[in-house]
């Protein structure tokens, strides 16, 4: 697998530097021992103040940065909640979706649009050229850590949002070994010792409602130009490779490769016969099935993180998604449900997290 060249990442630059400040110290010289002793005696009555300052400096050095982490299955509303929170708290968002880090396929990967970002800065979103290799969990840990430092240096709160729980664990775990998959055998490999002071919010939706919503979302994505986007992306050489890397793992790419192999995009075929229609429908059905499989896998991993000791607070977005699915329901009703059952509880959780010492 090609290793990613981090010099190609726009988000990583020379401005990510760390300066270390050391306390002044006295050098020990025999000729000045008597004067040093005299100095120590003169300062003795102020020793409690000095000790207090040193203790505070030590606490400051050991204090962990606070971060907010939005978890949830694909389509559950993580991006919306992260932006909603970022407009209420001084925050910037770090993408933790391993597919959305790459340039291109904005519809297929369901990247949040510029309009929906509402001016909130987003990091590690659509910044990596897919031709430069695959971003590993270890590389994400390094890149995202630098972004956290930069955001906190601006006195803002990093909000981490995305569906790749392996990336989330890589960034947050105090002990991280890239050779092991922490989710491979229960929660025994998941680190409960975290590098940051984390506020975890899990946006959850009931299975039946989320399933119906994801089916409809795929249809809406196809209507929005996903098929045309995939036809432009199709590469007959790369699609034939046994192992897929990076953005070529995105749901939609492998599912339509078989279709485009049979009906190449460069050939203008106006007529859609029954065979071509069946091949198209099969690809769409495969996307729906694989999207649902991904959602269930993501929820299982979140439960594993919780079992490992991560203090994850759950907010239920089911009513909001039911309102979206109902044709008779107005947008106002959907927004009311979202704000009452998802946003307001999340704001309270974040406020409590930020005021904790």
Curated annotation (Swiss-Prot):
Optimum pH is 8.0. No activity at pH 6.0. ATP binds at residues 72-79. It catalyses: dimethylallyl diphosphate + AMP = N(6)-(dimethylallyl)adenosine 5'-phosphate + diphosphate; dimethylallyl diphosphate + ADP = N(6)-(dimethylallyl)adenosine 5'-diphosphate + diphosphate; dimethylallyl diphosphate + ATP = N(6)-(dimethylallyl)adenosine 5'-triphosphate + diphosphate. Expressed in the vascular stele of the roots, in the xylem precursor cell files in the root tip, in leaf axils, ovules, and immature seeds. GO terms for biological process: cytokinin biosynthetic process; secondary growth. Induction: Down-regulated by cytokinins. Its EC number is 2.5.1.112, 2.5.1.27. Keywords: ATP-binding, Chloroplast, Cytokinin biosynthesis, Nucleotide-binding, Plastid, Transferase, Transit peptide. One of its GO terms (cellular component) is plastid. It comes from the Eukaryota. Disruption phenotype: No visible phenotype, due the redundancy with other IPTs. It is found in: Plastid, Chloroplast. Residues 20-58 are annotated as: Disordered. Belongs to the IPP transferase family. Involved in cytokinin biosynthesis. Catalyzes the transfer of an isopentenyl group from dimethylallyl diphosphate (DMAPP) to ATP, ADP and AMP. Adenine, adenosine, isopentenylpyrophosphate and 1-hydroxy-2-methyl-2-(E)-butenyl 4-diphosphate (HMBDP) are not used as substrates. This is Adenylate isopentenyltransferase 1, chloroplastic. The gene is IPT1.
